[in-house]
């Protein structure tokens, strides 16, 4: 059973409707179209980790804060532009902002907006069918969800267990269940 199938099954179990599932994981980002409880199509990011949860973890570390602190900072900031497409170059850009005395809140907000923008561009390439649902670790950040909703121009739903959608889908597949 593929990772895509697991996320599709888990997303369907959590959201219960045809939708576009966006999974922002630690190493990649997936946009998955689910219809009739089946994966119909998907697209994964083709760049480095700059549009993933790992990117945010690296940047939080660079700012010297935990992920919870990072999101709290981001919610209070005015986003600075983070334009580099590569994690290494983006980290250099963040270091430059720190060196220039920019507020950590503004840097954190810029990082979240950068990731949300990359995810939105992946969605544009794939296309969105139906409602949009977010899974993966970033679904725990209300600020990321709101930012992604703004980038997409439509609401993005999440679920308290959305970070576990892949594991849930794997369990459903292992049980031989099909909706």
Label every model-predicted segment.
Residues 124, 128-151, 162-166:
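Glycine-rich phosphate-binding loops at beta-strand->alpha-helix junctions
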Residues 24-35, 85-92, 138-153:
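Acidic-glycine-rich active-site phosphate/pyrophosphate-binding loop
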Residues 90-123, 163:
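Adenine-nucleotide phosphate-binding core of ATP-dependent small-molecule kinases
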Residues 1-41, 169-176:
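Conserved phosphate-binding catalytic cores of ATP/NTP-utilizing and phosphoryl-transfer enzymes
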